Amino acid sequence: MRRKIIAGNWKMNKTPSETVKLIEELKPLVKNDDVDVVFCVPAISLTTAIEAAKGSNISIGAENMFYEESGAYTGEIAPNMLTDIGVKYVIIGHSERREYFAESDITVNKKVLKALEHGITPIICCGESLTQREQGITIDWIRQQIKIAFLNVTAEQAATTVIAYEPIWAIGTGKVATTEQAQEVCAAIRVCIGELYGETTAEAIRIQYGGSVTAASAPELFTQSDIDGGLVGGASLKPDFGQIVNYK
């Protein structure tokens, strides 16, 4: 049985002082021994968040990282910088990074490899646009994203990663993929991993659904056979996140 993982993506929200306040507010609400709880916070708040989360079941993740360890990359953050302060997870390839910062599948792959090299668990995002869904190419599109993201990743490494399926048309729009749509794509992702690495790895890897997850939609989504939790956006900034974590 795969352990559920529910991660909050705070995006560009909350100052360091606001981060402390929110984590203190959420600590008692997200207690759940059966779920891995992760807060992915802005880079400037990572150290503060790690300190605030001490003694709780909350792990802290970054929202992005670069694929080099040092050098003339103004504004970027290296994986060894993240591990040095105790970061455990990193979101890679979020649709907003792809859209606003021109991240390609190849860039995503480089970041995945470097995160794994440094012992950081990557939360690898994939998803389709509304146009791609309407064209009926959702599965083909996502399979392509997965295959490139996992280039040169070993089966042992792949089993430790997290994949987040985020239909782009459902992010921050209030629209949610139906439970059937979400399960269909997550199942297809697991099949793709099985083709790349075999059934054992496919059954080990955890797949999240991300896209306007709410306390109301979480119970049905998270009880699907191939959905192992969620990558939660706006709702992770509210007390409602506690209800999502304790969805049962």
UniProtKB/Swiss-Prot annotation:
Which compartment or compartments is the protein found in?
Answer: Cytoplasm
Known pathway: Carbohydrate biosynthesis; gluconeogenesis; Carbohydrate degradation; glycolysis; D-glyceraldehyde 3-phosphate from glycerone phosphate: step 1/1
Q: Which molecular function terms from Gene Ontology are attached?
A: triose-phosphate isomerase activity
Gene Ontology CC? cytosol
Q: What is its main location?
A: cytoplasm
- Function in brief: Involved in the gluconeogenesis. Catalyzes stereospecifically the conversion of dihydroxyacetone phosphate (DHAP) to D-glyceraldehyde-3-phosphate (G3P).
Similarity field = Belongs to the triosephosphate isomerase family.
Q: What is this protein called?
A: Triosephosphate isomerase
Record the organism.
Lachnoclostridium phytofermentans (strain ATCC 700394 / DSM 18823 / ISDg)
